[in-house]
């Protein structure tokens, strides 16, 4: 009897897992590859490329396992256009992080149609950190990870229409735009 009960529990859990995989949003993300950012504190500075730091933060979060980097041959429910901006206030030792997000979904044959942008949002965080060129990469990754955690809860509340498959050809257009 307990063996049958255990089998039913395993079946129930696997059904939940499979339904979650089937109904989960398939998303792509885009971060402008060409931009570099610098953080400064008095005589020290730290330069980094937001796209590679964002890639690292996304890879470390299991909740983003169904989110792919934007590519022409990918088809998804929507594209997240991420623009992270960090600044450091040396006097108060605060690292400020903003994540500007646009959610794009093909709802018109014209790629640049404003109706294709279904949501725009801004997420902000801050951390008290001591500026150090050696550990600044860790703090940047930490604030990116925290921003992405806040973003996933906002995306879960957003109803993305699965009737508008979005291919990654828009990613090619985004790479040509200088922000």
Predicted regions and their residues:
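A structural "domain/chain start" motif
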Residues: 4, 9, 13-16, 20-65, ...
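Short, solvent-exposed, polar/charged sequence segments at loop or secondary-structure edges
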Residues: 45-92
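Surface-exposed short loop/turn segments
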Residues: 72-131
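C-terminal/domain-edge helix-coil "capping" segments
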Residues: 108-179
